[in-house]
Amino acid sequence: MLLFSLFIAFIWIPTIKRERIPFHVNFLAIFKALMTTILMSIVLAAGVAAILSSVDFLLFSIDYRVTLQALNIIGFLFATIYFLSLVPNYSQENPEVLARASEVPRFLEVLLVFIIIPIVAIYTFVLAAYVAINIGGDFWTNNLLEPLLVSYAIIVTVVYLLVCTIQHKYSELFQKIFPKIMLAVVLFQTVASVLRIQDYGITHGRYYVILFGIFSTITAIIFSFYQKNKSGLIAPILIVLSLISVAPFVNAFTVSRHSQENIQKISFHSLNYLT
């Protein structure tokens, strides 16, 4: 979680005092740099592995550790340096740098507008149908519900940040409608989590689900009722919640341990195992 907090801070800090660089623009720039780095690293790793395998098979034997070390260098050294080289330098607020940061490649634009957004819309319909058909009874304590709702909130948040710079009617509809749908979904998830806590206590996994529910609720409100240039407000909130989850006395494992101990004590007392 500390590394995750540092990564979010890495995206957020350059946008704090720069009105021309909102959070969603830098998020898009970092996303493009990350995807490009992953693609380049995979291609390079595949090429190096193929060359070493060919040498081992056709010419002379090569220790398998050579391949592992080569992949290690590509994955950690090359990928890190290449990723940092793609991160925009906003120190001088060069217009060309700002333009490149906010530019959405045609491939990514088509992928988001004509593939990702329709898929999210269909997934929303399926999720709503599942809730409408099965609501009531054991529905609220179903193990399947929490992962579905959490994954939906993550997808909507990421897609929203990526499509903010795209001028298209589908993108604009997504920005207007889906944050409000996400707010309703998060409320469902919060109710489901609270009901499961009453039966099973707090586990470390459910602790993170609750924290994510808090974050998603605030995020949905910001996306729904604030301008998209205010999207950076979600970054410090996410960082604070992430740090809380690893802080002494209130971290996930401490809270879940105390909760499970209390559940066991209550169960033992009800069965007269403890006097």
What is the predicted function of each stretch?
Residues 1, 57-71, 130-148, 193-208:
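Membrane-helix interface and helix-disruption motif detector
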Residues 1-110:
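Membrane-interface helix-loop-helix junctions at boundaries between adjacent transmembrane segments
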Residues 154, 174-226:
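Membrane-embedded alpha-helical segments of integral membrane proteins
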Residues 247-275:
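Membrane-interface segments at or immediately adjacent to transmembrane helices
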Residues 2-11, 78-80, 146-160, 182-188, ...:
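Generic alpha-helical transmembrane segments
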Residues 46-53, 123-128, 184-197, 247-258:
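Hydrophobic alpha-helical transmembrane segments in multi-pass integral membrane proteins
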